[in-house]
Swiss-Prot record:
Effect of residue 82 to A: Strongly decreased enzyme activity
Impact reported for residue 164 to R: Decreased activity with inositol 1,4,5-trisphosphate. Increased phosphorylation of inositol 1,3,4,5-tetrakisphosphate
Expressing tissues: Ubiquitous, with the highest expression in skeletal muscle, liver, placenta, lung, peripheral blood leukocytes, kidney, spleen and colon.
Role according to the record: Inositol phosphate kinase with a broad substrate specificity. Phosphorylates inositol 1,4,5-trisphosphate (Ins(1,4,5)P3) first to inositol 1,3,4,5-tetrakisphosphate and then to inositol 1,3,4,5,6-pentakisphosphate (Ins(1,3,4,5,6)P5). Phosphorylates inositol 1,3,4,6-tetrakisphosphate (Ins(1,3,4,6)P4). Phosphorylates inositol 1,4,5,6-tetrakisphosphate (Ins(1,4,5,6)P4). Phosphorylates glycero-3-phospho-1D-myo-inositol 4,5-bisphosphate to glycero-3-phospho-1D-myo-inositol 3,4,5-trisphosphate.
Enzyme Commission number(s) of this protein: 2.7.1.140, 2.7.1.151, 2.7.1.153
UniProt name for this protein: Inositol polyphosphate multikinase
Cofactor notes: Binds two Mg(2+), but the interaction with the protein is mostly indirect.
Organism for this UniProt entry: Homo sapiens (Human)
């Protein structure tokens, strides 16, 4: 039987000096929580992490996650053996004297680690000081997905195994579990949230729609964010397929993409553009506009050719619902736009036949397009939660299985 690895507490701060925080130089203790700007303040100006979607919540659990005034996040160390094990993992990967190529590569897929932090009033309360992956986003859409066929580690008791299996019996077959999500809806300027009960309700038949919900902003499916997420996951998969040092249990992927946008022109100009191009083509009520950086706005012209340029931000944005995706170089997704001469669905029509509801919807969609769109969406996918990571001499088949199935689900969302 395998023996559990030791978990020494190596207190060090491998991050850059400006991000290292020593308890001795923290500001004056604030004592009990006090309201500040509508948010409760804890521990030297720290506040509960507002955009947390899963895991231990500060104020609800004995341990939780806080936001430090410098923009980092503080994850309170869990009780032994989980907390010391996670601390050991971060110290091992981010050790200054680490020359292991596998671990150096792994750093790319983790939040940056800046050592440990503790408040002067409670020096024994240890927190992992980590990068806030959502920090650069204005309206971050966030999803936490537990990866692997088993959510319990090799040293779990029979009671623990039974408990974990009963929470989500499909874990072994599906290979991942949505623990929570927070999606920004542009039309209402608000967030839709789902917790772990939502993820546990998903079956083999509904998992695709359940995941795609994270990429829908209330107007359209963010296929650009889906495609970017696939690319990120594939890099993590490649790392797992080439390492036999570590096995991960009950670990997650954190997905983040930008949900907000800024208008490239005024509403009036966007409406004018919509009227101009829609007046030359037909868009039925059943057809769906989908949000993708590689799409084009199609319109009928005198010679039947395509592309209507609507500015740099719009010209590569939209197409009809009927699209063809092909896989290139491990799911590099490209779009084949049909020539209108071969597409009888687009028929010339006069302005009076324009559906007012469609035009109104287009105005809103155009207005909420992101500016300065790149070829691929700004997306972060990072590995988190390492309280159950163990040394190994074999490929982590359970994690690999989960990644592959998640990629398959995301591809099916693109191809549908």
């Amino acid at each position: 039987m395998a023996t559990e690895p030791p978990s020494p507490l190596r207190v060090e701060a491998p991050g850059p000096p400006e991000m290292r925080t020593s308890p001795a130089i923290e500001s004056t203790p604030e004592g009990t929580p006090q309201p500040a700007g509508g948010r409760l303040r804890f521990l030297n100006g720290c506040v509960p992490l507002s955009h947390q979607v899963a895991g231990h919540m500060y104020g609800k659990d004995k341990v939780g996650i806080l936001q430090h005034p410098d923009g980092t996040v503080l994850k309170q160390l869990q009780p032994p053996p989980r907390g010391p094990r996670e601390l050991e993992f971060y110290n091992m990967v981010y050790a200054a004297d680490c020359f292991d190529g596998v671990l150096l590569e792994l750093r790319k897929y983790l939040p940056k680690y800046y050592g440990i932090w503790s408040p002067p009033t409670a020096p024994n309360d240890l927190y992992l000081k980590l990068e806030d992956v959502t920090h650069k986003f204005n309206k971050p859409c966030i999803m936490d997905v537990k990866i692997g066929q088993k959510s319990y580690d090799p040293f779990a008791s029979s009671e623990k195994i039974q408990q974990q299996v009963s929470k989500y019996p499909l874990m072994e077959e599906i290979g991942f579990l949505v623990l929570g999500m927070r999606v920004y809806h542009v039309h209402s300027d608000s967030y839709e949230t789902e917790n772990q009960h939502y993820g546990r309700s998903l079956t083999k038949e509904t998992i695709k729609d359940g995941v795609s919900r994270f990429f829908h902003n209330g107007y359209c499916l963010r296929k650009d964010a889906v495609a970017a997420s696939i690319q990120k996951i594939e890099k993590i998969l490649q790392w797992f397929e080439n390492q036999k040092q570590l096995n991960f249990y009950a670990s997650s992927l954190l997905f983040v993409y930008e949900g907000s946008s800024q208008p490239t022109t005024t509403k009036l100009n966007d409406r004018t553009l919509a009227e101009k191009f829609l007046s030359k083509g037909q868009l039925s009520d059943t057809e769906v506009l989908e949000y993708n950086n590689n799409f084009h706005v199609l319109s009928s012209t005198a010679n039947g050719k395509i592309e209507s340029s609507v500015g740099k931000s719009l010209s590569k944005m939209y197409a009809r619902h009927r699209k063809i995706y092909t896989k290139k170089h491990h799911s590099q997704t490209s779009l084949k736009v049909e020539n209108l001469e071969q597409d009888n669905g687009w028929k010339s029509m006069s302005q009076e036949h324009l559906n007012g509801n469609v035009l109104s919807q287009l105005e809103k969609v155009f207005y909420h397009l992101p500016t300065g769109c790149q070829e691929i969406a700004e997306v972060e996918v990072r590995m988190i939660d390492f309280a159950h990571v163990f040394p190994s001499n074999t490929i982590d088949e359970g994690y690999v299985y989960g990644l592959k199935h998640l990629i398959s689900v995301l591809r099916s969302i693109l191809d549908n």
